[in-house]
Structures are given as C-alpha cells and as structure tokens.
A protein has these predicted regions:
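A conserved beta-strand element that flanks and buttresses the S-adenosyl-L-methionine
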Residues: 173
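Conserved SAM/SAH-binding beta-strand->alpha-helix loop
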Residues: 137-139
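N-terminal juxtadomain amphipathic helix
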Residues: 1-85
Length: 181
C-alpha cells in the first residue's frame, strides 16, 4: 500500500462531528521553507491543500487535511541551539522546573523531552540528571549519546525496537510541539 502525503478528514478531530464548515481555503501550498543541504535528502516539494474548517458542534478550528508526519519531520531543519533567544528561554525553563523537582526529589532525577530537537533543553539540566529525548528528525544525530539517551522516533513510539520501553519520569517537557498535534 502506497503511503499518501496527506489525507482529508471527514469528522472533527475532537468530538467526531461530521458537520465541518469551510472557513478559509488557501488552496495548495508548500509545506514549509527548507534549506537544501548538500548530500541531504531533498525536502518534499509538492503542494498540499491548506484549508481551515470549523466544527459546528465544538467550534474547533482545524486543518481539513492531515499531512504525513514523515514528510513534516524526517528532514526537519530548525535547531533550537542556533537561536540565542530560544537558548535563553530554554535555560530559564530548565532552571525553574529543576528547582521545583529538586524540592521533591534530590537524586536519581529522570527527565524526558518529547520533541527534543538538538538536545539544547536537555543539555541545560545538571549532569546528575538522567536525560532522555525523543525526536523523529535527523537532528538528534548531533546529540551526545553519552550524556542523553536518545530515541530517533515519533512519540508515541512507532519503531518496534522502542515500543517496549517503559519508564516513569520525574519530569516530562515538550516545547513547541503542541501546535503540530
């Protein structure tokens, strides 16, 4: 079976209602701007529909089409560590949440970052924290695997070798990912 780049939804993503009203249609658009690097896979270059619909039941505004997550994230190019503003924000966040978690637990602290990107957030945690990151993009290849346990996968896990990984964490973060759900 050939995997398609996108598919049309016929019911609300939240409540399942089938009455979806078109509110804006921007026709077909390129997914995102990408930097094409030498010896790297080319980004997806075909246009996909960009249409917003409104659920008549719960009023959720949502995309009419769902794009394949492989197309969206396998060749993702943005790295958190290259942006000073982002690094500063992530460091402040880690400082804040570390103080909170250290009041409850002083040792063996285990943290998970979903959508860990290049590991910038995880690198700000103290050395004695056990760090885990999940991200489907190739960017995780830059992370020092001696300092951070990395899963190059989607969350929840898609790869069979990761599906049996069961662990409780003291803290779970997920930055700049929820708008993709």
């Amino acid at each position: 079976m050939k995997k398609t780049a996108y598919y049309k939804i016929n019911q609300c993503r939240i409540c399942g209602n089938r009455k979806l009203k078109n509110i804006i249609d921007l026709k077909k658009q390129f997914i995102q701007g990408s930097f094409i690097k030498k010896n790297s896979p080319k980004p997806y270059l075909k246009k996909i529909p960009l249409k917003l619909v409104l659920c008549s039941n719960c009023s959720l505004v949502q995309l009419r089409h769902t794009t394949s997550k492989e197309i969206l994230y396998k060749n993702y190019w943005y790295e958190s560590g290259i942006n000073l503003t982002m690094r500063t924000h992530l460091k402040k966040l880690v400082t804040l949440v570390s103080k909170i978690i250290e009041k409850k637990k002083s040792s063996n602290i285990e943290v998970l970052d979903i959508g860990c990107n290049d590991g910038t957030l995880l690198n700000f945690y103290k050395k004695n924290f056990k760090k885990y990151g999940v991200d489907p993009s190739q960017i995780v290849q830059k992370i020092d695997k001696k300092k951070i346990n990395v899963f190059n996968d989607f969350f929840p896990f898609q790869k069979n070798e990761n599906k049996n990984f069961k662990k409780k964490f003291d803290l779970i973060t997920s930055i700049a990912m929820f708008y993709d759900l």
